[in-house]
Amino acid sequence: MSRIGRLPISVPAGVEVSVDGSAVSVKGPKGTLTHTVSAPITVVVEDGTVQVSRPNDERESRSLHGLTRSLIANMIQGVSEGYTKQLEIVGTGYRVQAKGADLEFALGYSHPVPFSAPDGITLSVEGNNKVTVSGIDKQQVGQVAAKIRSLRLPDPYKGKGVRYAGEQIRRKAGKAGK
């Protein structure tokens, strides 16, 4: 059995997990998430735990077993606690401003770069160089944070750009002078 897949998932108080055919929906204090489980995998909810099982040891079943268990565990954590990612903007003149629910970045281009959050994602600005992305869907939070980072990737020579909080940028030496 999959080492990850065979572990039961405990459901915290205030979170409700329901299985309807191949759809698993998780409802909690922060919202509701739904996931469609692939064919060979079965999900059973009993007395405060969720158990994911597979019918056979075929390669596809084994790979989907641990994946499904992790996705359901992430959904449960998302609706109970939520997920956040923090980004830092480093560089002279690089800054971010909140414009309503959207953000406007100054990243060294000749124009400001607007960025609007998709549904289910909250963007907040601390100071003028820190952005916090938060939401209940782990995948969506990570994807939005990656999109913001891709607006100006960190430069390997000076380290300027948008980076995750705590991210170490590999620096390169400049040209050797004569």
Swiss-Prot record:
First and last residue of the signal peptide: none
Molecular function terms from GO: rRNA binding; structural constituent of ribosome
Transmembrane segments: none
InterPro entries: Ribosomal_uL6-like (IPR000702), Ribosomal_uL6-like_a/b-dom_sf (IPR036789), Ribosomal_uL6_a/b-dom (IPR020040), Ribosomal_uL6_bac-type (IPR019906), Ribosomal_uL6_CS (IPR002358)
Biological processes, Gene Ontology terms: cytoplasmic translation
GO cellular component labels: cytosolic large ribosomal subunit
Keywords: Ribonucleoprotein, Ribosomal protein, RNA-binding, rRNA-binding
Record-linked Pfam families: Ribosomal_L6
Keyword Ribonucleoprotein carried by entry: yes
KW Ribosomal protein (keyword) present: yes
Record note on quaternary structure: Part of the 50S ribosomal subunit.
Purpose: This protein binds to the 23S rRNA, and is important in its secondary structure. It is located near the subunit interface in the base of the L7/L12 stalk, and near the tRNA binding site of the peptidyltransferase center.
Family: Belongs to the universal ribosomal protein uL6 family.
PANTHER family linked to this entry: 60S/50S RIBOSOMAL PROTEIN L6/L9, LARGE RIBOSOMAL SUBUNIT PROTEIN UL6M
The protein's name: Large ribosomal subunit protein uL6
Organism of provenance: Kocuria rhizophila (strain ATCC 9341 / DSM 348 / NBRC 103217 / DC2201)
Gene that specifies this protein: rplF
